[in-house]
């Protein structure tokens, strides 16, 4: 088959023109996704030149390039204008960084913190504009939630409340379910589920009026049975189902609901080794003697060490999560789910499509590779395996 010198040149000119236009409009970012798309287009060009006649190669490559750039384009966003957003859990991590970014964009930000004198609260007070208002709130205290609701209604009387970001979260134990006090399950549910539920319900009249947004930070641990994270994971599973229900029920009111499910990021709450050491010592002090003998203190130390080792993979750059929250607040058509982080696509593929035995093996090797409890080790007297 006779080939043209460069039959796809017109397609590449079309792709380049559109890419340049999107870059000038800030609808496209220079980065790995764009470079990967261009590499795939180059490979497709090579195949088309060898397998298709020139007109067909031109059409296929132009169509593929157009689709790729459409997928990479930022979705249309709403103007910030005078929009107000309430964010919980702004002492550290995602909440603090999101509050700073939204304030810089021109939002009116109401940022709740556990302690108005915490380092994070002081940082927000120093770095942000007078538009940002700090509010003290403990999600386990109904009186704190009621006070924040009243302040929010008064503070947004002229602008309305556009968005609620349920970011505050808590995990206080990394241990097998049998070793975890029931109180830790209740505590996680109080913060991660009931507190968010009460606050969200209280703000619905304002959000219905603005036809605004509800954005909640969940976790993959609410979708997959991570070993030793049952207390945290069950609370995140509960809040995800609640938000999905809100998404259905509030659709007629024009409220859009999104859940952010980040991978492992280096936030203070996650990577504070001294805090996890204190929690481990508290756990050891409260385990009944007979149960501790069955599992062994070395088993608990091993789990603790494996958990801390897994945190080495935590990503220091929190911007993917912050960007996902902002997109959920401002995109004309936000997604119902966002998965910022590295490797989540593979994890969810394994969870949904591979056999149960392989899923369990993957989670244990990826997160915590268990040591056998003392009573089950060879040479130890203990219960016979079932």
UniProtKB/Swiss-Prot annotation:
Residues that bind NAD(+): 82-111
Gene Ontology CC annotations of this record: endoplasmic reticulum
Disulfide cross-links: none
SUPFAM superfamilies cross-referenced by the UniProt entry: NAD(P)-binding Rossmann-fold domains
GO biological process, one term: regulation of blood volume by renal aldosterone
Cellular localization per UniProt: Microsome; Endoplasmic reticulum
The protein's enzyme class: oxidoreductase
Residues at which substrate binds: 219
Catalytic activity, reaction form: an 11beta-hydroxysteroid + NAD(+) = an 11-oxosteroid + NADH + H(+); corticosterone + NAD(+) = 11-dehydrocorticosterone + NADH + H(+); 11beta,17beta-dihydroxyandrost-4-ene-3-one + NAD(+) = 17beta-hydroxyandrost-4-ene-3,11-dione + NADH + H(+); 11beta-hydroxyandrost-4-ene-3,17-dione + NAD(+) = androst-4-ene-3,11,17-trione + NADH + H(+)
Single GO MF descriptor: 11-beta-hydroxysteroid dehydrogenase (NAD+) activity
Keywords tagged on the record: Endoplasmic reticulum, Lipid metabolism, Microsome, NAD, Oxidoreductase, Steroid metabolism
Assembly and oligomerization: Interacts with ligand-free cytoplasmic NR3C2.
Name of the featured protein: 11-beta-hydroxysteroid dehydrogenase type 2
């Amino acid at each position: 088959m006779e080939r043209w010198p460069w039959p796809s040149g017109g397609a590449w000119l079309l792709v380049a023109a559109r890419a340049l236009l999107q870059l000038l409009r800030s609808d496209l970012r220079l980065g790995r996704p764009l470079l990967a798309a261009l590499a795939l287009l180059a490979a497709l060009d090579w195949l088309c030149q060898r397998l298709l006649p020139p007109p067909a190669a031109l059409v296929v490559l132009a169509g593929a390039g157009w689709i790729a750039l459409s997928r990479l384009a930022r979705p249309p966003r709403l103007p910030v204008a005078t929009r107000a957003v309430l964010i919980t859990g702004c002492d550290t991590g995602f909440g603090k960084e999101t509050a700073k970014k939204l304030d810089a964009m021109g939002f009116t930000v109401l940022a709740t913190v556990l302690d108005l004198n915490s380092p994070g609260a002081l940082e927000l007070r120093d770095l942000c504009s007078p538009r940002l208002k700090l509010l003290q709130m403990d999600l386990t205290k109904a009186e704190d939630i009621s006070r924040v609701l009243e302040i929010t209604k008064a503070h947004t009387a002229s602008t309305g409340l556009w968005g609620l970001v349920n970011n505050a979260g808590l995990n206080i134990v990394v241990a097998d379910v049998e070793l975890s006090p029931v109180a830790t399950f209740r505590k996680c549910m109080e913060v991660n589920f009931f507190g968010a539920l009460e606050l969200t319900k209280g703000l619905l009249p304002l959000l219905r009026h603005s036809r605004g947004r509800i954005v909640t930070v969940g976790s993959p641990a609410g979708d997959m049975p991570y070993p030793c994270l049952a207390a945290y994971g069950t609370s995140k599973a509960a809040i995800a189902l609640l938000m999905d229900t809100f998404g259905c029920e509030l659709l007629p009111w024009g409220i859009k609901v999104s859940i952010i499910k980040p991978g492992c990021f280096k936030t203070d709450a996650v990577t504070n080794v001294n805090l996890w050491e204190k929690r481990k010592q508290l756990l050891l002090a409260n385990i009944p003697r007979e149960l501790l003998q069955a599992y062994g203190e070395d088993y608990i130390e091993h789990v603790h060490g494996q958990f801390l080792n897994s945190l080495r993979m935590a990503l220091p750059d929190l911007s993917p999560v912050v960007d996902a929250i902002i997109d959920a607040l401002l995109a004309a058509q936000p997604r119902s789910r966002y998965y910022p982080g590295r490797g989540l696509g593979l994890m969810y593929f394994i969870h949904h499509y591979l056999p149960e035995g392989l899923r369990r093996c993957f989670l244990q090797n990826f997160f915590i590779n268990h040591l056998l409890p003392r009573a089950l080790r060879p040479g130890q007297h203990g219960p016979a395996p079932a």
